[in-house]
Amino acid sequence: MGSVKSSNPALEGLHEELGVMEEQIRSIIESFIELGVSVYDFPGTPEASQGMVTNLKRNVDRIFKLNQTSNDPQSALKDVNVPLEVVQYIEDGRNPDIYTREFVEAIRRSNQYQRAKMHGMGMLRDSLAEKIKEQFPELKDDVENIVQRTNMKPTGQARVNSGTTNMTTTAEQSNVVNATAGDVGTNANTTESVEQNGI
C-alpha cells in the first residue's frame, strides 16, 4: 500500500496538468470558431478589423503558451506520448476512446491466445511424457527432468502484473515449452532408431 500512496502525488500532478491542458485546447478551439464566424460576417469596418486582430493575437498567444507548457522539462506531460493512431482518430472525427478500447481488447485476445497455446503445449508435453515413459522406461529420468524444467507455474506476482507483462511472460513460457517439447521428440526418435537397429 505504501508504494501506491507514494505514486499518487505524481499521478495527481499529471491529471491536474492534463486538465489545464484540456482547458487551454478547448479555449483555443472556441476562439478559432469565433474567429471563423467573425471572418464570415466581417463588415469591413475599422472596429471589426481591430477586433479580429485582437482575437487573432489572443489565439496566437494561447498557442504559444500551450507550446511552452508541452515543452517544459519540469512538466509531467513531457513523458506523455500520444499515439499517432489517436491523432488519426481525432482527424477522422472518431472518438479516441475507441482506440483505447480496441487496444485493450487486442491485448486481451493476444494474452488469451498465448495462454491457451501454453496450456495446450503443457497438455501435449504431459501426454507425450506419459507415453514415452510407458514405451521407453529407460528414459523415465530424462523425461521427468524435462517435465520438471518446463513446468513453469505463474507466481502470485505474475498474476497481479498488467496484461502486457502477463502476455510477455506467457509468450516466454510458450517458447520454453516448444523448445523442450522438441527435446522430448528428439529423445523419442533416437530411442526408436536405436531399437530398430537392434542396439
Swiss-Prot record:
The UniProt entry, under Pfam families, shows: Med10
List locations, semicolon-separated.
Nucleus
Report which superkingdom the organism of origin falls in: Eukaryota
Q: What is its main location?
A: nucleus
Kindly state one GO CC term assigned in the UniProt record.
Answer: mediator complex
Sorted alphabetically, the keyword list is: Activator, Nucleus, Transcription, Transcription regulation
Q: Has UniProt tagged this entry with the keyword Transcription regulation? A: yes
Q: Which InterPro entries match?
A: Mediator_Med10
GO terms of biological process kind? negative regulation of transcription by RNA polymerase II; positive regulation of transcription elongation by RNA polymerase II; positive regulation of transcription initiation by RNA polymerase II; RNA polymerase II preinitiation complex assembly
Please give the Gene Ontology molecular function terms for this protein.
Answer: transcription coregulator activity
Sum up the protein's function in the record's words: Component of the Mediator complex, a coactivator involved in the regulated transcription of nearly all RNA polymerase II-dependent genes. Mediator functions as a bridge to convey information from gene-specific regulatory proteins to the basal RNA polymerase II transcription machinery. Mediator is recruited to promoters by direct interactions with regulatory proteins and serves as a scaffold for the assembly of a functional preinitiation complex with RNA polymerase II and the general transcription factors.
The family line of this record is: Belongs to the Mediator complex subunit 10 family.
Q: What name is this protein filed under?
A: Mediator of RNA polymerase II transcription subunit 10
Q: Identify the taxonomic lineage of the organism of origin.
A: Eukaryota, Fungi, Dikarya, Ascomycota, Saccharomycotina
